[in-house]
Amino acid sequence: MSSGGLLLLLGLLTLWEALTPVSSTDRPEFCELPEDSGPCKGLFHVFYYNPDQSQCLEFIYGGCYGNANNFKTIEECKRTCAA
């Protein structure tokens, strides 16, 4: 196969991987953590993955501490945690 064909195949495989949903076995453990606003008083609209509802939901983040189940965009949340 030519190098151009290999590059095309590599690009298609990369795209396939990016578009394939995350399965529950591949989901990072932090996706199971509850929403955590943290102790600070900010009002940041962010998203977390809710494993009981199997979807990303919005919550208010205070701006400090909290946990890793905290995403700036719903797209990032879905890409990381949603099955």
Swiss-Prot record:
Domain BPTI/Kunitz inhibitor per the UniProt entry, residue ranges: 31-81
Its job: Serine protease inhibitor.
Signal peptide: 1-24
Organism: Cryptophis nigrescens (Eastern small-eyed snake)
Cysteines paired by S-S bonds: C31-C81, C40-C64, C56-C77
Entry keywords, A to Z: Disulfide bond, Protease inhibitor, Secreted, Serine protease inhibitor, Signal
Tissue expression notes: Expressed by the venom gland.
PROSITE patterns cross-referenced by the UniProt entry: BPTI_KUNITZ_1, BPTI_KUNITZ_2
Source taxon at top rank: Eukaryota
Keyword Secreted part of the UniProt annotation: yes
Major subcellular location class: secreted
GO CC entries: extracellular space
Site (Reactive bond for trypsin): K41, G42
Gene3D superfamilies found in the cross-reference section: Pancreatic trypsin inhibitor Kunitz domain
Protein name: Kunitz-type serine protease inhibitor nigrescinin-2
Family in the record: Belongs to the venom Kunitz-type family.
GO terms of molecular function: serine-type endopeptidase inhibitor activity
Keyword Disulfide bond on entry: yes
Subcellular compartments: Secreted
